Amino acid sequence: LMEYLLKNTTDKKERAYLLNHYLDSFKGTVYRQTQFAEYEMLTNKMYEDGESLTADNLSSVYLELNKKYYGSDIISDEHIAYEWARIPHFYYNFYVYQYATSYCAAFSVAHKILEEGTPAVERYKKFLSGGCSMAPVELLKIAGVNLETPAPIQDALNAFGEIIKEMETLVED
């Protein structure tokens, strides 16, 4: 849908809005959920290593990850360190990475459909008809997406980079 909307808009402001929405969706699903998954991994390792899981320790880890993920160009308000305490994803064990991988898999399927047409649509239908007959990673292979390789994630990240470049060009004009 996003590709269709971008292809068919001639209004610069609408295009900027669509690109921003695309980027924000990508950032929130791929980068932020990966950040959350890394936070869970690090805090679980702290526990396994016998470290105390105090609010100060958990907040410190979260703040450092926030700085890592947002980079030095973004000023991190020190209060962001406490955000971990209000994120419901952390009430249940490690699963948020699936948001990022699923987004990249869906991105890959959609782009295969746009590039290949009918053959990719047929593979997608076969994937859908597979239901729960096998593991999701195996079902995705039917659709032409192999999450056991870095390709789907790298392709999505490359596209994200291109969308950023387009947005930068658009706002410079």
Model-derived regions: residue spans:
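Core active-site phosphate/anionic-ligand binding loop and the adjoining beta-turn-alpha structural block
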Residues: 31-39
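Hydrophobic transmembrane alpha-helical segments of multi-pass transport and channel proteins
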Residues: 26-30, 93
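Short beta-alpha connecting loops at secondary-structure transitions
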Residues: 18-25, 46
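C-terminal, non-catalytic "cap/extension" segments appended to globular domains
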Residues: 1-13, 37, 44-173
